[in-house]
Amino acid sequence: MPADDPGAANGSDGGAVSGVPTGPKLITTRFDQADGYTYDGYVRSGGYEALRRALTAMTPDAVHDQVKTSEIQGRGGAGFPAGVKWGFLPDGVFPRYIVVNGDESEPGTYKDRMLMELDPHQLIEGVVLASYAVGAAQAFLYVRGEMALAQERIAQALNDAYANNLVGTNILGTDFSVDIHLSWGAGAYIVGEETALIESLEGERGMPRLKPPFFPAAKGLYLQPTIVNNVETLSNLPWIINHSGQDFYDLASPTSTGMRMFAVSGHVNAPGVFEVPNGTTTFRDLVEAPEYCGGVRNGRSVKAFIPGGASAIWFFPEHLDLPLDKATVDQAGSMLGSGAIVVMDDTTDMVAACWRVVRFFARESCGKCTPCREGTTWLERILKRMLDGNGRPEDLATLVDVCESISPGLAWPPKQTTICPLGPSAVSPIVSAVERFRHEFDHYVEHGRPIDGVERHAIHGTSGVAVHV
Amino acid sequence: MSESTDDTQASDADEDVSADDVDAAVDEEVTEEPEPEDDSIKLIIDGVERRVDPGGLVIDACNEHGSYVPHFCYHPRMSPVGMCRQCLVEVEGPRGTMTVVSCMTPTADGQVVNTATPAVKRAQEGVLELLLANHPLDCPVCDKGGECPLQDQAFSHGPGESRYVEQKRHYEKPIPISDLVYLDRERCILCDRCTRFADEVAGDKLIHFVSRGNNTQVMTFPDEPFVSYFSGNTVQICPVGALTAKPYRFKARPWDLDQVESTCMGCAVGCRIVVQASRDEVIRYQGVDSDAVNWGWMCDRGRFNFEALNSDQRLSEPMIRTESGLTPTTWNIALDAAAGVLRDALATPESVGVLGGSRGTNEDAYAWAQLADVMGSSYRDAQVGDGLPTGILGYPRATINEAANASTIVLMGPDLKEELGVLYLRLRDAAEKRRSRILEFSATETGLTPYAWKSIRHEPGAQSAAVAAALSDEAIADQLAAGPVVIVAGRGNLAESPDAVIAAVDALFDAVPEATVLPALRRGNVNGALLMGMAPADDEHDALATLQAASEGRLDVLILVGSDPLSDCPDADLARRAIAGVARVISVDTHPTASTQRADVVLPASSFAEKSGTTTNLEGRVTDVNQKVTATGTSRPDWMIALDLGVRLGERSFPSDHPLRGAATVDDVTEIVASTVEGFAGASHTEVKNTVDGVVVPAHVPRATSAGFSPPPRNNYDYRLVISRKLFDDATGTQMSRSLANLAPGGGLYLNPLDVAQLGVEVGDDVTVTSAQSTVVINVAGDERVPRGIAWSPFNQAGASVGDIVDAGAGVTDVRIERAG
Amino acid sequence: MSRLSDHHVIVANDIIARCPRPKSALIPVLHLAQEQDGYVSTDAMEHIAELIGITPAEVYGTASFYEMFKFEPVGKYCINVCTNISCQLLGAWELLEHAEERLGIKSGSTTTDGMFTIEDVECIAACTEAPALQVNYRYRYRVTNEDFDALVDDLRNGALDDEIPPHGTLARVRQTTPDNWADTGRRAQEAVDAR
Ligand SMILES: Cc1cc2nc3c(=O)[nH]c(=O)nc-3n(C[C@H](O)[C@H](O)[C@H](O)COP(=O)(O)O)c2cc1C
Ligand code: SF4
Ligand code: FES
């Protein structure tokens, strides 16, 4: 069993073996450097040069301009261009805040944790750059509660960065000052949603706020203007400043710029996290190329795959050749989301897979909106009953109908009767699976067991988490 | 005037007896579309063009214009949370048609809103089905059944039947979350109304959502109950039967309830309420949303003291004293006895005193004042030495709304949270919403201290000096100059001279001449009674002077009209000597009190809800009070008793041309008041009956004068005493209400913990407290809100008679505290 | 059980002082309480309410939203088996079943000796290393039944004491407030909040 050391990204630093697109590593360069996470290791490998350059030779607007030019899309899920988002801050309203979203919990997603554990200074440098660009008074780095090592490494890195005058008062002798406060969660997926994250940072229950009126850029933390960015998004800033926004833009396709990290898990031979050219690499490249996952396990074939985290509509073999391009994937009816690809081979029990994803959302609903609080649990119960062999013929209709109450029209992008997209996310696996694999559901209802040829899981009535209220 | 309407049920308001978020009368009053005002905006709601004021929410615009939008979490007096998702409507916007929650969507000019498209109906049905999925559907045994927004909307906007066959949520139920409120978590639909109320409105964040997702519940902290003076409001605004009030549980079904709109007379705020009765018994009050006064809220004392009306201790027949004590008799005999006593006394001038009137209506007080006039009695007062001189009504007066919108609210007097609960809510709101800054002068910390911009502590009696010091502070002077200033003035300390307050108010007026005053006298209709003629002409004839005269044997008869000096006069010794020293006592009351025990004639008065009339609140707002149930026993309204007596006094009877001679009904008296009492011309019966908010009348009394007041110097060894009221005390209305009786904290002497330590005593020990007047033994408690060198004790509590050590004649009360025994 | 120790009060006040509003320190301070006692006791919540200036009900309201906070004692080692989709596909339920058998308890409960609690949890961001678990939030990747047994033995005999602290302790390195803490955020926010 590999011990608790974060696996390095199996990056494609060698030449192209199978003709897949290649590019430089931007943010995973220190993943193989044993001391890359330390202050010395970071500085030795060129760290904090971007910050020095920005603070001494660039105006805040110039930094912002580079980010705009790069057209870097947010890596947290929504894919909104960071430069544009920063531009939404209202003029002259202070204090304003930067909030770093390190709550990574979307099923399948695994990259922010690596960035925090293996290269915390890179993130800190990115945060100070962003704070400089927008004039933030303080930044909050919110790390998921369950990530003890990431918290430890960031705490150490922050203490070292302060000691070396890279954060805090008069950074590097300039008159720019900003603090970074490390905060962390305590186990709640919804806190990844930016307004819920803000609530959590305010010491509240992590329940999302309605947008509008609570767009963070206008009314965020303490109702002050606030920028929430993902860890991966901000980790790219040092590279962008060291090179240029244009260099970043030129790396991949014009609709999805730069390099991007993808985690590929599930039924593949060599699951892993890869930093690949955004927009040009295809799903098939990731799944099949020897530099990446090296194909589906046991020589089997893809039955379905989740292209962008548990909230995404599922894709099928015919989608494998789509490029990892936001516009293309949106067009095809799903999303790249948080860069989480989960591959299911032809032995997968689709009802069980669907249930598992729904169960996640049911368990993680914050409880604020009636449709999500009541609906997701209802969906989960029906599916579980089917898995237990107690499905009824009318269940499938009820299932779809309850989905409709949460996400009217079952369209993509989803409409919602809820405040945030969590509720509708529970609808994604159901519409995906029921549409394509209806016979598997019918078979459960009729025979109380899955169709032949799929793997059964030892799912049992679990009580979830210990000693909760 | 309409009866109250439930905000969730505008469509069939007539049958609806719930007063949930009542916005009475307003709907019906405005029957046609208001004329477009200059700044109004246009909305197309369900295809019809409507004009609304800008700055509102779509939900209100729809509901005001007949397109009813179902909702649960939205409450017009709290910030919207968009939680239940029931109020979904379609709004056409630049990005196409959007389904949005109308409770959080601001209106905009030209907005197109649809509330009844198939998509909206589908969405609303879906939400309702989901709300009902885990609901126990135990309507037949639920207090709310019949007036339940969930039930009603399931009927009007629901899918008809549930397909939910899974196991429902189960919780232990119902659980008491306080002395007055039970919680049934299975019925709860998590609308956040009660929790928001506790947080936003009351500031008592003692109930909260706990756990997450499908397990979310409303709960208190383990072993820390929802102790709030305003807990009953959560029951009223709960849109299901999750919160129920102990005093009402299982008492009635809503469809058996009859109701009438009225005004709570529990204190001088005068909250608008509906009085609900079943089988001729009052069983519930609900707050009505009066924009000017209470916004739908009530305090628990006002809400639940209806129990006292039904108390089996009520005085139900007249009594006269015989050898065997107080003996029931007929009205004729009792009235003749009383009249005989008075006729004898009236042979000597100024030998009859009349105290009271503030418990009854304006009409009651008016009739008694008229009787005092014809008897030539100058000794009269609506207070018992526990308020301020009548001249406090003579300053330029502020309304509650003016206070709650002033740039500065100066607090000079009682702890409003304890004495005038809903005024506390309104002023707290003003501070929390940053409309106003509170500048507080007080001897100890009060309920509003946490919300005060500046809270200035002064020694008892030293408020003038504190004002002078404050005025020399630049920040305070700037603030007072920044905009309207309202001074809320009342009697914060019963162990100190009221002159201390008047002197401080005058000092403020010298600096801010354009300030206005909101008098914070506490008793129900004290303002009305004073204006009706129950105000003493001068210091020589006020309540204390009356009691003094009685104690010296100068009075032959003392008439107590709902007044109990033995409990309410701060100088307990004076009250006792007075009651002992006067030859005869005639008591007109609803319940037996310490003073009725001493009476020679007891005349039973009808209580609130048993009689009609008008009342005047602390702003001078005259509103109506209405009868809902038959009077107890043979009791009569006070005004009628005055009239009955007033015709039996021989040559001192009401003259034949006296207007009251012709009064047959209370409405006649209301008209007489309107036509004869200066300032009340606008408060005629028709004017008052047609408005929820009533009519504000001016007070024609001379402004109080203070010759300045400064407290005597103090001796380091002594503590200076503060005696003030708590919301719950030994008052009759509270003690006769089963559910409230135990909420009175009981007597005690509260000292700063450092002083407790310095005295070498432990909390809970008995100490002797010695003033120039007397000595009492009392239990000591530590309280950080009491500054060092000050001793605070709650007034009129069981177990300690702190009144014994107060000398009404002294400016302040200094006491020596020693370990007892 | 207990209020925060003097040392933890110092740490808590340091965190509170860094926050523009005191309540922002609530979750980190709750973690301190859990670090001290292994769970968040009622007394600790009352103490935290005092330190931050809110009601205990507010503390509890926030704390109970988050799954990591326990309000009753759990095992010294909390073993969280991820059963979410990537792990389910690669045998997480079978691993959980083995764990339950091996420890003789159901998921969600604690062994009678107070050593182990098992939970089945949602995705822990180790999807490419499925099936994965955490012991007191320290990762173990691609766990087989044999790995699990060895893990339990090592935990019991103390072989992992250095690596894995008892339940409640997360990061063993804390951010401290340095001399060059700029404090502009807190001061600016306080100015905005001042009435
Ligand atoms: C239910 C939900 C969960 C989310 N979880 C995360 C998360 O764990 N990490 C993250 O960075 N963004 C998450 N997001 C997206 C954030 O709301 C936000 O868009 C993002 O942090 C913005 O950063 P970016 O612009 O750099 O991508 C989530 C959104 C939703 C609706
Ligand atoms: S959709 Fe679900 S998770 Fe999102 S705010 Fe509503 S209840 Fe909470
Ligand atoms: S009333 Fe609008 S969401 Fe509840």
What are the functions of these language-model segments?
Chain A
Residues K68-L89, G185-E199, G203-R205, A362-G375, ...:
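Conserved phosphate/anionic-ligand binding catalytic regions in large, soluble enzymes, centered on
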Residues M1, D5, A50-V67, F94-I98, ...:
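Ferredoxin-type iron-sulfur electron-transfer modules in oxidoreductases and energy-metabolism complexes
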